[in-house]
Amino acid sequence: MSYAPPLLRLAASPHDTHLLATFSQDSNIIRILDVRQPGQALLELRGHAAAINCIEWSPSRRGTLASGADDSLVLIWDLLSQSTAISPSVPAVNGAPAPDNTRGPTASWQCDYEVGNLSWAPHSSLNNDGGDWIGVSGGRGVWGVEL
């Protein structure tokens, strides 16, 4: 009998408390779950080429999530934007269209190392220029990335 890999991380949205972002061990797919409708992912976020290590929702942008992975990428996901929908590569089954629940990233940043962790900077008088910042750790370094 084959078992699904264990969930590795879970992040609750600060703006939509019924939404959770999660990924499994050794997975490159983030799943967005609605706790009011358990059992099926609302969205799948695909864009990483290697195992994901971290996810975090933006504290200031509703529906925005950042992720980091072993592919050395930080990806930004905008769940509210329809322009990030990916045409499913899965063929139609019995003439029915494939589900439209896959999204691609809206922005990316290449790190010099595998991304171990990340965190959104809270807004303050030090960064009130309108931009968002993400702290990224990889290898033995830490970077500040402005969006």
Predicted segments — roles?
Residues 1-18, 50-57, 112-126:
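Canonical WD40 repeat/beta-propeller blade segments in eukaryotic WD-repeat proteins
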Residues 1-2, 41-47, 86-110:
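Short C-terminal beta-strands that terminate individual repeats in beta-propeller domains
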Residues 9, 16-22, 30-31, 40-43, ...:
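Structural hallmark of WD40 beta-propellers
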Residues 15, 38, 50, 57-60, ...:
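Short amphipathic alpha-helices and their capping/turn residues within compact interaction modules
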Residues 24-25, 69, 137-139:
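Structural signature of WD-repeat beta-propellers
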Residues 26, 76-78, 116-117:
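Eukaryotic, compositionally biased intrinsically disordered regions
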Residues 30-34, 74-79, 143-147:
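WD40-repeat beta-propellers
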Residues 119-147:
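Blade-level signature of beta-propeller repeat domains, shared across WD40, Kelch, NHL, RCC1
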